[in-house]
């Protein structure tokens, strides 16, 4: 069976492994987008270290879990969002104000909705984590 959404699969794999209590998880196939999402999650303290392992195919990410994720998921369809509308999407996807992050793909790279709001740029919503 083919994998339709690698990002959604990776985030659900991380969430399920956190709930079971695992300390690390292997995510495959690896992609640049998944790597950028993992980088943003690491910068915000949701995961520990992660590394890319080349297996001769698409690659694998090894992610250290620290038990801080309640839920993580991909946002489909990837809604376009303007800089002034982040509050609406926060209310829709996050459980409380200033709790969790929305991950946004912008023209300046992948970042959280808070960074994008500070820079005054919009983009496309790709994931949420809390």
From Swiss-Prot:
Keyword Ribonucleoprotein on entry: yes
Pfam families: Ribosomal_S8 (PF00410)
Any one cellular-component term (Gene Ontology): ribonucleoprotein complex
Any one Gene Ontology BP term: translation
InterPro entries given in the database record: Ribosomal_uS8, Ribosomal_uS8_CS, Ribosomal_uS8_sf
GO-annotated molecular function: rRNA binding; structural constituent of ribosome
Keyword terms, alphabetized: Ribonucleoprotein, Ribosomal protein, RNA-binding, rRNA-binding
Source taxon at top rank: Archaea
Function: One of the primary rRNA binding proteins, it binds directly to 16S rRNA central domain where it helps coordinate assembly of the platform of the 30S subunit.
Assembly with partners or alone: Part of the 30S ribosomal subunit.
Protein family (similarity comment): Belongs to the universal ribosomal protein uS8 family.
Name of this chain's protein: Small ribosomal subunit protein uS8
Organism annotation: Thermococcus gammatolerans (strain DSM 15229 / JCM 11827 / EJ3)
């Amino acid at each position: 069976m083919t994998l339709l959404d690698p990002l959604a699969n990776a985030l659900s794999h991380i969430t399920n492994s956190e709930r079971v209590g695992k300390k690390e998880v292997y995510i495959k196939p690896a992609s640049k987008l998944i790597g950028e999402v993992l980088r943003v999650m690491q910068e915000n303290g949701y995961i520990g270290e992660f590394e890319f392992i080349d297996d001769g195919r698409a690659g694998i990410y090894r992610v250290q879990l620290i038990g801080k994720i309640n839920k993580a998921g991909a946002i489909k369809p990837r809604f376009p969002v303007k800089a002034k509308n982040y509050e609406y999407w926060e209310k829709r996807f996050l459980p409380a104000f200033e709790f969790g992050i929305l991950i946004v793909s912008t023209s300046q790279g992948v970042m959280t909705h808070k960074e994008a709001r500070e820079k005054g740029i919009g983009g496309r919503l790709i994931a949420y984590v809390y």
